[in-house]
Amino acid sequence: MAGQTIIVSGLNPAAILQSTIGGGASPTAAAAAENGTRKVIPLSRDALQDFMLSIITQKLQDEKQPFYVLDLGEVVSLMDQWKSALPNIRPFYAVKCNPEPSFLSILSAMGSNFDCASRAEIEYVLALGISPDRIVFANPCKPESDIIFAAKVGVNLTTYDSEDEVYKIRKHHPKSELLLRIKPMFDGNARCPMGPKYGALPEEVEPLLRAAQAARLTVSGVSFHIGSGDADSNAYLGAIAAAKEVFETAAKLGMSKMTVLDVGGGFTSGHQFTAAAVAVKSALKQRFDDEPELTIIAEPGRFFAETAFTLATTIIGKRVRGELREYWINDGLYGSMNCVLYDHATVNATPLAVQSNRSNVTCGGSKTFPTTVFGPTCDALDTVLRDYQLPELQVNDWLVFPNMGAYTKAAGSNFNGFNTSAIVTHLAYAYPS
């Protein structure tokens, strides 16, 4: 079965994984598939690209809208990596990163819990039949209406970093357990630092614990976030050390024993994850080895989402200025590529020349030109790529962007009437080679 790809569009993700049972699938894949009943067909190892081409061929007859492909095989592989590297840390996937329902479903089937930041995100998760006790409401500053909703539906674990939040929770959800969100010592290498906005300073920890104690609220533990996409695994070392100090302060105040440590997010896949896992385990052993009953959770988003999604866009316009080629595509910085601005992402494009070069759609060996790629809106800021090398392409050819799962569609807008939320996601399962 290795090297094959199963392709399906619009099916229950668990049904897709059903065909992995008995075919060398990992235990994670098998567990995710146990309730699946619908048949899927295995295809050749190149079928993922073939699948995209088949979708494009269908779209040649209609409006040629952009689309995503979600590779569930990649998600299974990433979950296996997580459980192998961090077996004692429960992932609570950060829904804000990418709330695609099929993606949430497959993560749930593989045992992930969920980090939600709003009522809407809680509703996304509950709508999939997921129990509220698998949700942490990990937003330190919540509208009162959202706290009331959390109490109503039974989401009973949340974060705080201010006295005002204590008062809101005491008033509207006194049964909720709290995690004190602290500011990490260092998050300077994160793509998106969290420290300037969230997290208690060292001198604020004791007053915030006392405030919760006076309000007769239960502080079950500590949370932190080193920042989204942090490349420096050493950031976890200082943050975990600071968390231990909070545990000790709570004990000195006579508070109930803390039982939860939330090490937040910041994880990326690949070699950086390996380094982060080593750093986290080392720090936990050093600081919390005397806490055998401690529950440790994390809030990975990018780790699971980024590499699992591929975006396909149509070339809708072209201009030639000497050697320079300029193309307009039907998604851009106000849509999925908002990650270039807000997430400091670097995007890469590969061609599928279905209109101009059908005998060599990937344009292998073709001459390339300095290229600018614009998004579809009227704003000149909407420029996806500059000084990028691409072959000669034409209107109705396609550009494909890999690694487009993290903070893309989730943060897109409908500016100029280009509706990011309407972009369709197709499902595939590519077995690891």
Swiss-Prot record:
Key words, A-Z: Alkaloid metabolism, Chloroplast, Lyase, Plastid, Pyridoxal phosphate, Transit peptide
Protein name per the record: Ornithine decarboxylase, chloroplastic
SUPFAM superfamilies: Alanine racemase C-terminal domain-like, PLP-binding barrel
Originating organism: Nicotiana glauca (Glaucous tobacco)
Gene Ontology biological process: alkaloid metabolic process; nicotine biosynthetic process; putrescine biosynthetic process from arginine, via ornithine; response to jasmonic acid; response to wounding
Site entry: Stacks against the aromatic ring of pyridoxal phosphate and stabilizes reaction intermediates: 225
Induction: Induced by wounding.
A GO molecular-function annotation: ornithine decarboxylase activity
Cofactor: pyridoxal 5'-phosphate
Gene (name only): ODC
First-tier enzyme category under EC: lyase
Location within or outside the cell: Plastid, Chloroplast
Pathway assigned to this chain's UniProt record: Alkaloid biosynthesis; nicotine biosynthesis; Amine and polyamine biosynthesis; putrescine biosynthesis via L-ornithine pathway; putrescine from L-ornithine: step 1/1
